[in-house]
Structure formats: structure tokens, C-alpha cells
């Protein structure tokens, strides 16, 4: 479930800084010209019980209207794909990616609905999170519902100065437990192959 909310928040932060500024100034909707986004990421997870943080690497891709791919490459490869309303998850076993049945479709449908709101520029029209703007580059999400708060106590996303693309995500999961993701090699509105969203 946590990776679904992380996935949502990454896509939520895609729109440009002009839309962010408009939302901070009064919640007005902004016209977005987003067609696609790709980036690499490094995820570092800190837990009190661990002597060293857990480090994972991967990539994500998004294409309008609702095609998304979230892929962990190391230490264990897994792929989450959402395309045309369908959700598929693959996990590597014995060197091959195998599809996992029974993915959490209910949660994923909620995520897709939230993504649509954000891509339409509705930054503050959010039923699940209280959204606050720390500065012109940082947005903080505080869960409204206890069900979500039990998993995530708070999230901060930081937008880069160039093109308004995502720089990092900080997920606060409890005392001495947090996850930070840093993004690189970001590209926007490039032509993406259809196969990215149809299979592993």
C-alpha cells in the first residue's frame, strides 16, 4: 500500500512550478501541457531496527491520460503498471518477471482518481490529504484519514527550479522511520514506447 501512495505522490508532483504557484496563491486551477514524464530514482529507507538503511534503485514513467509504470531495478526487480484502467504487478523470481494476481485494485483505483485531480491542476481539492505549501518549492501532505495516517504520518515533496520537475520525496512513517527518494535523469514530454505500459 505504501508504494501506491508514493507512486501517487510522485505523479502528483509532476506539474510545473507555475501550477504550484497558482495553487499556493489561492487554489486556482492551472492549465497543464504535460504529455509524459520519465525519471530514475534512488530510494533510501531508514528504520530504527536497521544498522544501515535499505537502498533501492529504479525508474518511473508516466504518459497521459492514465498510463503509469513504476519499476524497482535493485535489489529486487518488480514492476507496477497501470494502463487503460487495468492494473498489473510483476515480481522477479528465478530470473523471470512473473505476474502477481490479486493486486490491490481498490487502492489503485483511488490513486488513479487522485492523479487525475492533480494533473488537472487541482492542488488543494484533496479529500485524503491536507496540503500546505512550505515555500515555492516544497509541498507538505498530512493525511486526513486514520487509515492512511497509520501508514504515513507526513510527506514532503520538493520541486526543482528547472521545469518544475520533482527533486525528492520524504515520507515520514513513524518515530525514526522514514524514506527519502531522490530523482535524476528527468525528462518531460518525450515520446514513450507503448510497450512500457503493456508488459514488463
Where are the predicted features?
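Gly/Pro-enriched, hydrophobic low-complexity segments
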Residues: 123-200
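An acidic-aromatic
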Residues: 59-111, 179
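Amphipathic hydrophobic-ligand
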Residues: 51-59, 82, 156, 177
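Bacterial N-terminal signal peptides
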Residues: 5-15
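Flexible, processing/modification-adjacent segments and terminal tails
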Residues: 22-47, 51-53, 86, 91-147
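Sec/Tat signal peptide C-region and signal peptidase I cleavage site
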Residues: 15-21
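One face of beta-strands
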Residues: 35-43, 56-60, 66-70
Amino acid at each position: 500500500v505504501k508504494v501506491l501512495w508514493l507512486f501517487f505522490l510522485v505523479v502528483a508532483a509532476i506539474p510545473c512550478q507555475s501550477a504550484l504557484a497558482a495553487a499556493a496563491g489561492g487554489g486556482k486551477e492551472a492549465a497543464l501541457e504535460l504529455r509524459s514524464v520519465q525519471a530514475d530514482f534512488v530510494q533510501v529507507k531508514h528504520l530504527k531496527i536497521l544498522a544501515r538503511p535499505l537502498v533501492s534503485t529504479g525508474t518511473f514513467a508516466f504518459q497521459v491520460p492514465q498510463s503509469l509504470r513504476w519499476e524497482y531495478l535493485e535489489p529486487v526487480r518488480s514492476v507496477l503498471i497501470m494502463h487503460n484502467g487495468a492494473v498489473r504487478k510483476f515480481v522477479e523470481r528465478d530470473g523471470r518477471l512473473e505476474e502477481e494476481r490479486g493486486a490491490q485494485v481498490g487502492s489503485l483505483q483511488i490513486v488513479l482518481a487522485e492523479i487525475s485531480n492533480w494533473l488537472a491542476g487541482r492542488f488543494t481539492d484533496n479529500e485524503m490529504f491536507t496540503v500546505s505549501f512550505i515555500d515555492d518549492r516544497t509541498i507538505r501532505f498530512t493525511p486526513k484519514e486514520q487509515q492512511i495516517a497509520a501508514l504515513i504520518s507526513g510527506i514532503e515533496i520538493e520541486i526543482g527550479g528547472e521545469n518544475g520537475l520533482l527533486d525528492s520525496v520524504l515520507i515520514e512513517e513513524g518515530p525514526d522511520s522514514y524514506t527519502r527518494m531522490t530523482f535524476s535523469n528527468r525528462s518531460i514530454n518525450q515520446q514513450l514506447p507503448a510497450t512500457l505500459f503493456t508488459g514488463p
